[in-house]
């Protein structure tokens, strides 16, 4: 019987990693992005991995890029700066890369949920949205979560920023649950954006 509560991982060969839940943000030592919630950790070394970084697949396919075959890499190819095609943030650690097209996806961005719900508003993941983001006010090329009524539009990276800015309200229960006075109250249980036990990088 497989024990998912404790694993061995090539990126941390000296100790096993234990599955834990944290209400405090952590930096993933795999993809180098911030996460919150369930993750694998080594308490001895202060080493953490998102669920999606720990349980990676050698090869994946993504519906937004039907012609691509993404391969898991420990670090970005070449020595040139690269960015994630999902969130548009820099890629500095674990990544899924398509050698044919040159696209890159953080492991957590590759596994983002297609929808987020909080009881009031449902947001759906889109590859391209022409409207500006409800949080930053900018239009962008990154993936976005958008409500069916098109009233709310949030970049994937902005969703993660909102999560980190409000982690105490969301996970500790201090204060109101509303993410922002401008945005809907969305209860993110991301496994980024590691986005996601439902999203957290």
Predicted regions and their residues:
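Cys/His-rich zinc-coordinating "finger" modules and their low-complexity flanking regions
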Residues: 1-201
